[in-house]
Amino acid sequence: MRGFATHRGSAVSFFPVIIIGAGAAGLMCAAQAAARGRQVLLLDHANKPGKKILMSGGGRCNFTNMYCEPANFLSHNPHFCKSALARYSQWDFVELVVKHDVPYHEKKLGQLFCDRKASDILNLLLAECDEHGVDLRLDTSIETITKLEGGYRLHTSAGEFSCESLVIATGGLSIPTLGATGFGYQVAKQFGHTLLPTRAGLVPFTITEPQLKALCTELSGTSVEDCVVNCNGVSFKENILFTHRGLSGPAILQISSYWQPGDAISINLLPHIDLPAWLASQQQDRPNSELKTLLAELFTKKMAGLLAEQWFVSKPLKQYTPAELEAVAQKLAEWTLVPAGTEGYRTAEVTLGGIDTREVSSKTMESQKSPGLYFIGEVLDVTGHLGGFNFQWAWASAHAAAQFV
């Protein structure tokens, strides 16, 4: 039960569990801990909960993935996520979605989206919190956290609070306009945790090489379906999108999590076609056709013209030697470039790196440095692929902690 403790002469509101961060992980953990009968205070510095939920999935929230498994996550400690994901699976969250009569559908590749709006997921979480008596307080900034014997004391803009269990669910650094800060990392550092280097993940690439940038700018808004993008031995087959500043689209966002500055990426623009064989047969069947005419059957007319102009000499197919045709096939199947950088946290969907999971219990999410302190969600060094995996990590890690706080 909530009560009051006197500490150094001032009234301190006591809650057994305090959770900082009312995003996906924080809301889920609050609801589940409260369902166990724990009195929970959920704090956030923002004026509204779940802002990132509302803008996710183009406003429809890709809330999980049917094919979620540990292989879909990046971490310096890849085994860490296995326990939580096994104990609260994608189907457990789907059950919750069904319980609240939220209509949903699979878009593709196992990605589950709301039929209506992302607010259905936020409202579901808020309803669960409300049902179990979670005390949600917004517009509350945390000024200091102090370790007490058997708990923690928080000095906030809304007064003094103390707790037995303190859960940090403040997310990473991505999309600062939605309120992202490095608060969780500061808390971890304060209590002796190791922080692994952070960088933007699931983020578009920027291009500065003049000719390549001109190509991207000219083709801005053009999408090419089902390309295979490769970097450092990892590949993804998805769409790519040309932008004014470089390259984006699902395949690019996915590979960005495996890219380091200076690395080259390779793009197969036509993985579904045996290009050498196709070009040879076209040369035989249509010797007078120009290369750009041929390319216009595979890409938009504008893209075909630009590629023919910048990459190749467009001439009738009969004038190409076998070696020249081979070079055309090679370029289309292995377009290699070195991005100048990424768009950074401003547009990144996630933050790579974070709190070293080797210092956190994979069963309970509790700190091994400071008993009673828990970390869940994106603040940890666990990053999912694009497609609902990061939400599933939020639900699973929140559920894990909620059973023990």
Q: What are the residue ranges of the model-derived segments?
A:
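Glycine-rich FAD pyrophosphate-binding loop
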Residues: 34-58
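A glycine-rich dinucleotide-binding beta-alpha-beta segment and adjacent secondary-structure elements
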Residues: 138, 305-383
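N-terminal Rossmann-like FAD-binding beta1-loop-alpha1 element of flavoenzymes
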Residues: 15-42, 401-405
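Feature captures the FAD/FMN-dependent oxidoreductase FAD-binding
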Residues: 87-165
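Glycine-rich active-site loop/strand segments that organize a redox cofactor
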Residues: 60-106
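Glycine-rich loop(s) and the adjacent beta-strand/alpha-helix scaffold that form part
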Residues: 165-209
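An anion/pyrophosphate-binding glycine-rich loop and adjacent beta-alpha core
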Residues: 47-49, 54-55, 63-70, 103, ...
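Short hydrophobic core segments
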Residues: 18-20, 142, 161-177, 240-243
